[in-house]
Design a protein with these regions (language model features):
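Class I SAM-dependent methyltransferase SAM-binding "motif I" and its flanking Rossmann-like core
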Residues: 94-95, 101-164
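Conserved anion/nucleotide-ligand pocket segment
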Residues: 149-197
Length: 205
């Protein structure tokens, strides 16, 4: 049974994690900051690890762009949850693909580990990330070769930062160019999509 928490920003809604992952204290989370390494505001994305620690979690950080396959596999295997930060979505997808971390994550989620995706981390959870071009630059990911297939953890696409002060207009533009067949789910920074098996709900802090 798949369990996911997909957010624009984790800090405002992190306390909602307990709805899909009870008894957080003492559990371990794999923290993947890779997307934030190619973002001018990456430091703020990485601050989520302090929120995770405040919830009682042990944080194991690993950058999949530079870590070995063995280290990534070991890190994920020893965790109860996987957290993927915001940042540049295209660089994140490229790194997940070339390190094979994406396959390891998808398998772990299928086996019951909870996936927490923030902004870029939420976008890559869907079937395809091409739509996020209106918000993110492809420049940091020259080896994607126009293959925008996401991890496919869910069958819908998150549009983060709707109504936000910085990226709200980009999010609105994505929605203007979408249609019902695209299965877009826009979320504000104070909202989260919680997936618990067949149950999917949009919640607010």
């Amino acid at each position: 049974m798949s369990k996911l928490m997909l957010v624009s920003a984790f800090a405002p809604v992190g306390h909602l994690l307990g709805r899909i992952e009870p008894n957080l204290k003492g559990k371990t989370v794999t923290f993947i900051p890779t997307a934030s390494m190619k973002d001018s505001t990456g430091f703020f994305n990485r601050m989520a690890k302090w929120k995770l620690r405040a919830l009682g979690l042990n944080v194991q950080e690993i950058d999949v762009a530079v870590a070995s396959y063995h280290d990534i596999k070991t890190n994920i295997a020893s965790s109860s949850m996987i957290y993927v930060t915001g940042g540049n979505t295209f660089y994140l997808l490229q790194s997940l693909r070339y390190s094979s971390a994406g396959e390891l994550i998808a398998q772990a989620v299928r086996e019951g580990k909870t996936y927490i995706g923030e902004s870029a981390g939420a976008v890559v959870a869907g079937p395809n990330i091409e739509y996020i071009k209106r918000m993110d630059s492809e420049d940091p990911a020259p080896y994607l070769d126009s293959n925008y297939a996401g991890l496919g953890l869910v069958d819908f696409s998150i549009v983060p930062h709707i109504d936000g002060p910085a990226l709200g207009e980009s999010a609105a533009e994505i929605m203007r160019h979408s249609n019902s067949d695209d299965h877009m789910v826009p979320i504000r920074d104070d909202q989260a999509v919680l997936v618990n098996g067949p149950h999917i709900e949009l919640v607010e802090r």
